[in-house]
Amino acid sequence: MKYIVKATSPLNSYEWMNSPSKKALVLMSGGVDSSAAALLLMKENYSLAGMTMEITHSGSSSAVLSASSVCKELGIPHFSVNISEEFNRKVILPFCTSYSRGLTPNPCADCNEKIKFGVLWDAAEELLGNNFSVATGHYARIIKKEERHYLAKGANKAKDQSYFLSGISAQKIPRILFPLGDFRSKEETRGLVRSSGLAVSERPESMEICFADEEGYRAMISGDQKPGPIRDTSGKVLGDHKGIGGYTLGQRKGLGIASKHPLFVISIIPEENTVVVASRAEAFRSEVTAGSVNILAPEYLKEGLFLFGKIRSQGE
């Protein structure tokens, strides 16, 4: 597929593409983290270029402008790629349809796997070849052990984003750089950018889904949502919900039903349009079923191996 790539800040773009020195393409959002990643790589004498994805939503154009501005300040080329069609198909549509199936989507993980390290990676190679590393401002690490490269947690436990990166192809990991992996706080990152004099240093951190705020994403999934019963494990109806898309497994708050003891969502049954709740003791499970498994270190999988699983980004 041919991608529409714009040289938004064409400074030294020809020289970068033909540079014999070690090169890195920084996927930039125009925020503090990706700008800090670029600064750190410049200190390591990488020849840099920036690339930003352009998608049709309210924040996309400002991200491109901000990233382009940062690249101009750094004196490096910047490219933008319009991937609206792919983003809608690979991230937004699955996000919306998951709720109607009683599932809780993870759009950030989908975006990392299918867009940043998928579509954007392919667009970069189509334009620039493959003799460069790809860097982002994620708080995670790539470690090398016995000639193999592995995805690892970032040093900052609260900011660690390895959970959202676990879908990346193992074949791509050797070419990936996470310069912020050893940073232990957001203030440390912001301090680096501030000391460099970049105007982006005071840009606020975004905590929302990039393509919709809380109200917006509720509106996106409300079209096929219908009221239905909330019941307990005995079948007793305790109340009503406004649509199964507003609930997720393990949820306790916002159920809208009165009870002497805390109740948790333990099951969502789409075909019955039903939400099932139970006590904390009943909410635990001894078995889980994993889907879309991506094995990054198959050599460690051995019979009898004891493993830990992680079901949300801030879980253990």
Predicted regions and their residues:
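ATP-dependent adenylation/nucleotidyltransferase module used to activate substrates
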Residues: 1-167, 185-188, 192-194, 265
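AMP-forming adenylation/ATP pyrophosphatase catalytic core
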Residues: 7-13, 17-21, 135-316
